[in-house]
Amino acid sequence: SDLIRETMDKKFKDITEWLIKGSIDFNFICESLLPSLCEEGSNPLKVGRMEYDAIVVPDCETLRSSTLERLEQFRNQGGKLIFMGNAPVYENAVTSDRGRKLYEKSVCISFDRARLLSALEDNRTVTLRYADGKLTDDFIYQLRKDNDCEWLFISHCCEPYNKDVFRSKNLRIILG
């Protein structure tokens, strides 16, 4: 229905915004392409040229067998597997308890910004904090490797309350 679709769209938008504004590096992994990009689960999970120490499964009702297989292997080898919201109840769109069993062995959090950022705290590459220690929520960054150099670009991502008044903010930038 339209209401279900709207809810799913909102959750997708929310998790994307929480990760970006929470200074967490991430990529979306396409479940249909996963078998061709990741032959088996490992820790870190190797998908194409990328490697992942943490995987977030955001409130999925169904997962493919091939995805569950790789996630189980990743988790069994010590990878950080985080489920947000409810456990998957379907495997290949058929009722199954395989997703629930994996869910129960993993980090389980509610669909909430603070819990997500807290669960991923140890996986940060760059941390942006205000002088008072709070995480920023109005900056984004990009860290690039270019030959033997690394470049860090930080930018505001929100419109200021009043464009005519400049408000400076002291930031603490932590790499690694």
Ranges and model annotations:
Residues 1-176:
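Carbohydrate-binding surfaces of carbohydrate-active enzymes
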